[in-house]
Structures are given as structure tokens and as C-alpha cells.
Curated annotation (Swiss-Prot):
<feature type="glycosylation site" description="N-linked (GlcNAc...) asparagine">
    <location>
        <position position="348"/>
    </location>
</feature>
<dbReference type="GO" id="GO:0019899">
    <property type="term" value="F:enzyme binding"/>
</dbReference>
<protein>
    <recommendedName>
        <fullName>UDP-glucuronosyltransferase 1A5</fullName>
        <ecNumber>2.4.1.17</ecNumber>
    </recommendedName>
</protein>
<keyword id="KW-0732">Signal</keyword>
<feature type="transmembrane region" description="Helical">
    <location>
        <begin position="492"/>
        <end position="508"/>
    </location>
</feature>
<dbReference type="Pfam" id="PF00201">
    <property type="entry name" value="UDPGT"/>
</dbReference>
<feature type="glycosylation site" description="N-linked (GlcNAc...) asparagine">
    <location>
        <position position="119"/>
    </location>
</feature>
<dbReference type="GO" id="GO:0005783">
    <property type="term" value="C:endoplasmic reticulum"/>
</dbReference>
<dbReference type="GO" id="GO:0042803">
    <property type="term" value="F:protein homodimerization activity"/>
</dbReference>
<dbReference type="InterPro" id="IPR002213">
    <property type="entry name" value="UDP_glucos_trans"/>
</dbReference>
<feature type="signal peptide">
    <location>
        <begin position="1"/>
        <end position="28"/>
    </location>
</feature>
<dbReference type="GO" id="GO:0005789">
    <property type="term" value="C:endoplasmic reticulum membrane"/>
</dbReference>
<dbReference type="InterPro" id="IPR035595">
    <property type="entry name" value="UDP_glycos_trans_CS"/>
</dbReference>
<dbReference type="GO" id="GO:0015020">
    <property type="term" value="F:glucuronosyltransferase activity"/>
</dbReference>
<dbReference type="GO" id="GO:0046982">
    <property type="term" value="F:protein heterodimerization activity"/>
</dbReference>
<keyword id="KW-0325">Glycoprotein</keyword>
<keyword id="KW-0812">Transmembrane</keyword>
Length: 534
């Protein structure tokens, strides 16, 4: 009889997987990081910190003019000059954020948004041209012999650069407009139950919603072409051959999606798609004495955390006063990240701060609710820590995120332009006092955390995997090599249809010939019979 410790097979497998995920099996490598600024950068930097800790050389390549990407001790920052200044960039960004709160006519608002987006697209494309034509920098990047390019493909310049340098790429993203993530992975994307980005549809759609789901990408096709086509033209110029946008995004060896099926709806995936939703929840830290004091002073009622994200610094006075009025009518202490003008009616229970440790505050047991713009980072921090939400989506996929969480019973959504002080007050009291919201978000939190490998470890593993194997061609589906009609088997269907029609035609002709023969023979017999009777 065997003696000793008997470890059940599932626990043993999980333990080995966890051990593999934390051991630095890859030799020290060189990682070129081309990030997208803003909130996209904030989660990527956690992966860079871990890659550096595991002995890899990390180089971040970005514009001289940016929001958050500054020198840190776990990467080397390389910047390149562009033809516009920090002041010009800041003015453009301010115009973008101010447009969130405009209440003008829909067509005027749409026109203004399109103008802002067009200006931003032109600036980003111009900076890409300046990067790729910076011969000294490109020579330096070639000479450094990087093992992998880690980038967010929200802007396509890094995809062009990775292909130009012939370096395997790992994409780190939430999503890409125009369904380029589906096209780049050749992932099935049926419109019958997979809601399109920006539609706010769920996965259970009515007939009219499915019509909207099918038509929406068609309506955006012109805008998508206008934004992405310049990068295809730039790549075609560099490679001296025709290169499409899909060719650029298909270069990625592995796609690291900042999502999972707790927040997102179930859908098909491909072998090189890895889900790392909640990666920004890693590395929680103790609160400073300042924030601990705020929480201790809140008493039994606890606190509410309020942040509309890193891009919103100023709210119109009338709207800010309506918000302040609602916050003053709840017993909780409210920590509001706000750098704009202090509302004149701000109540004693509301504390304005220029910055707050959002994830760490949400992880405190005295936090009762989270007022958020429903960006993916904030939503995941809410899920990780089990805090119900009042959501005020402003732009982009925030409307979709809010719809998902509201559908799952984890929060309440308000239209920030139309809501009144009473609406916000009622929403806060609902998510704080109605236990179902807390129960639902705790259920989502439990599902999200029940996994063998943490998202950060998973992301680092796949970056190292691509470095070790110089890509991941074995995960690339053959669908990339098919034409559109081969992918949908239209040539096979056409061939089989032609065979069926040919067989049917020959059968018909044979039957017709036989019928005529039989009919002709009967006619001759009848004539012969008549002639005999006469």
C-alpha cells in the first residue's frame, strides 16, 4: 500500500499551472512597448512592471507630447519629436472632454464630435508618419534586436511598425473600433447574438435590435475607412506592395483582451485570443493615512467613491452643482476626484480630491458604492472588489459597459446630460440600500476570481511565450489565407449547386427523351391498328 500525501489530480494540475505561471522560464529578452496614452496605458504599465521584475529589458516608445507616459524605474523611455506642442495637445484634449457635457442639437453635437475626432486622427497619423520616417530612430530600433512588440492597436501605427521591423507582436487591448479585432483574429462574429461595439445591445436582441446590430457597422464603414485607410497607404508605401488594414492587424501573434465572460457576453474565440480582464486590479496597496482618516470619520455609514475617469477634469457649473446637491443628501462620506471649480453648494460630507487610489478605496470594506463613467478599468475594479455602481457613461464603449452591468443587476445607469439631482440621489440610495445590487456584484466578483491563473501572470506568460518561440504561428488559423468567398465556401456551394442543377437537367432531358420515345411508339401502334381495321 502506498503511503504519503495523496493530492487530488485537479488540485495538482492547478498547482503546477500556477507554478509555471510564476517561474521565469524565459531568458532575459527585449520588449519594445508602443502604448496608447490615457487609461489604456494605466493597465499596460502593470504588465511592464512584472516583465521588468522577471529580468526583461523593457523600452517604451512614445511621443514627446503625451498625458501620462513618464519615465519610471522599471522601463526605459524613448521619445520622438513631433510637429505639435503640449499646449496644442492639451487644448485638443480639453475640447474633447468638454464635448461630453454639451447639450446642443444632436446634429450640431455630432458635427462637433466628428471635427474633434478628425483633428485627433490627423495628428496621430501625422505623428506616425514622422516616426516611421525618422531614419535614425528606425535604425536604432532595428539594431536593438527586440524580441517582441507589445502594443495597444487602438491606433494602428504600432502595427505598421511591428510589421516593418519584422518583430512578433502581442496586442494588448480592450477592443478596436470597426470590428478590426474580429477581422484580425478571423474570429466568427455573427450579428444575431454578438452585440456590435457602441450599439448598447445585449446578447438577447429583439428583431429591431438585430436589424440595428447588422446595419450599424455599415453606417460606420465610411468613418472606419477614413480613419484606418491612411495607415494601410503608409504601410503600402513602406513595403512597396499593397497592404490592407486587415493585413496589419493580422500580424499579431497573440491578442491579450482586457475582458472576460463575467463582464462581457459569451462568444466564440480563437486560439490566439487570451482574456486578461481585471489585470488592473492587481497589486493593491494599503491606504495612506489621509484616506484612512476619511474612512474612519465616516462612521457606520461608510464612503462612496466618485470618479469620472482620468480625462474629465471640469464639469459645467450647473451640472456640478446638481451633482453636489445629490451627494449632500446621503449619509455616506463621498470622496470625489475632481480638479475643476469647487461647487458653491458642496456639502460637508463631500470631499474633493485631485487624485484618489481608486482600486484600494474600492477594496475597503466600508465602501458602499462607486459613481463611475463605466470605463472598463473602473468597472473591473468594482467587480474585483464587489462594489455596486451608479454609472454615468460619457463616450466610447462606456455605454456598452454600463448596459452590461445594468443587465447583470450590478448597478444603475444615468444619462449624465439629462439626469437631475433627484435622479442621482435615488440611484445612490437604491444601490446602497437595495441588497440585490450588492449580492449581484458579489456574485460577479466570485465568478471573476475563480480561476487558476491571475490575469497579470497570464499576460506576462504569453508575452514570454511569444519571445521564446519567436511568434505563435501554430495558433494562426488558416482562415487568414482564404479569400472571402472561400471562407464562406461560396465556391463549394456554387460547385455543388452546379452539379445538382446539371444532374437535374440531364435527368430531366433523359426523362423527356424517354417520354417522347414512349409516346411516339404508342402513336405508331395506334396508327397501325387503325389501318388494319379499315
Amino acid at each position: 500500500m502506498a503511503t504519503g500525501l495523496q493530492v487530488p489530480l485537479p488540485q495538482l494540475a492547478t498547482g503546477l499551472l500556477l507554478l509555471l505561471s510564476v517561474q521565469p522560464w524565459a531568458e532575459s529578452g527585449k520588449v519594445l512597448v508602443v502604448p496608447t496614452d490615457g487609461s489604456h496605458w494605466l493597465s499596460m504599465r502593470e504588465a511592464l512592471r512584472d516583465l521588468h521584475a522577471r529580468g526583461h529589458q523593457v523600452v517604451v516608445l512614445t511621443l514627446e507630447v503625451n498625458m501620462y507616459i513618464k519615465e519610471e524605474n522599471f522601463f526605459t523611455l524613448t521619445t520622438y519629436a513631433i510637429s505639435w506642442t503640449q499646449d496644442e495637445f492639451d487644448r485638443l484634449l480639453l475640447g474633447h472632454t468638454q464635448s461630453f457635457f454639451e447639450t446642443e442639437h444632436l446634429l450640431m453635437k455630432f458635427s462637433r464630435r466628428m471635427a474633434i475626432m478628425n483633428n485627433m486622427s490627423l495628428i496621430i497619423h501625422r505623428s506616425c508618419v514622422e516616426l516611421l520616417h525618422n531614419e535614425a530612430l528606425i535604425r536604432h530600433l532595428h539594431a536593438t534586436s527586440f524580441d517582441v512588440v507589445l502594443t495597444d492597436p487602438f491606433h494602428l501605427c504600432a502595427a505598421v511598425l511591428a510589421k516593418y521591423l519584422s518583430i512578433p507582436a502581442v496586442f494588448f487591448l480592450r477592443n478596436i473600433p470597426c470590428d478590426l479585432d474580429f477581422k484580425g483574429t478571423q474570429c466568427p462574429n455573427p450579428s444575431s447574438y454578438i452585440p456590435r461595439l457602441l450599439t448598447t445591445n445585449s446578447d438577447h436582441m429583439t428583431f429591431l435590435q438585430r436589424v440595428k446590430n447588422m446595419l450599424y457597422p455599415l453606417a460606420l464603414s465610411y468613418l472606419c475607412h477614413a480613419v484606418s485607410a491612411p495607415y494601410a497607404s503608409l504601410a503600402s508605401e513602406l513595403f512597396q506592395r499593397e497592404v490592407s488594414v486587415v493585413d496589419l492587424v493580422s500580424h499579431a501573434s497573440v491578442w491579450l483582451f482586457r475582458g472576460d465572460f463575467v463582464m462581457d457576453y459569451p462568444r466564440p474565440i480563437m486560439p490566439n485570443m487570451v482574456f486578461i480582464g481585471g489585470i488592473n486590479c492587481a497589486n493593491g496597496k494599503p491606504l495612506s493615512q489621509e484616506f484612512e482618516a476619511y474612512i474612519n470619520a465616516s462612521g457606520e455609514h461608510g464612503i462612496v467613491v466618485f470618479s469620472l475617469g482620468s480625462m474629465v477634469s471640469e464639469i459645467p457649473e450647473k451640472k456640478a452643482m446638481a451633482i453636489a446637491d445629490a451627494l449632500g443628501k446621503i449619509p455616506q462620506t463621498v470622496l470625489w476626484r475632481y480638479t475643476g471649480t469647487r461647487p458653491s453648494n458642496l456639502a460637508n460630507n463631500t470631499i474633493l480630491v485631485k487624485w484618489l487610489p481608486q482600486n484600494d478605496l474600492l477594496g475597503h470594506p466600508m465602501t458602499r458604492a462607486f459613481i463611475t463613467h463605466a470605463g472598463s478599468h473602473g468597472v473591473y475594479e468594482s467587480i474585483c472588489n464587489g462594489v455596486p455602481m451608479v454609472m454615468m457613461p460619457l463616450f466610447g464603449d462606456q455605454m456598452d459597459n454600463a448596459k452590461r452591468m445594468e443587465t447583470k443587476g450590478a448597478g444603475v445607469t444615468l444619462n449624465v446630460l439629462e439626469m437631475t439631482s433627484e435622479d442621482l440621489e435615488n440611484a445612490l440610495k437604491a444601490v446602497i440600500n437595495d441588497k440585490s445590487y450588492k449580492e449581484n456584484i458579489m456574485r460577479l466578483s466570485s465568478l471573476h476570481k475563480d480561476r487558476p491563473v491571475e490575469p497579470l501572470d497570464l499576460a506576462v506568460f504569453w508575452v514570454e511565450f511569444v519571445m521564446r518561440h519567436k511568434g505563435a504561428p501554430h495558433l494562426r488559423p488558416a482562415a487568414h489565407d482564404l479569400t472571402w468567398y472561400q471562407y464562406h465556401s461560396l465556391d463549394v456551394i456554387g460547385f455543388l449547386l452546379a452539379v445538382v442543377l446539371t444532374v437535374a437537367f440531364i435527368t430531366f432531358k433523359c426523362c423527356a427523351y424517354g417520354y417522347r420515345k414512349c409516346l411516339g411508339k404508342k402513336g405508331r401502334v395506334k396508327k397501325a391498328h387503325k389501318s388494319k381495321t379499315h
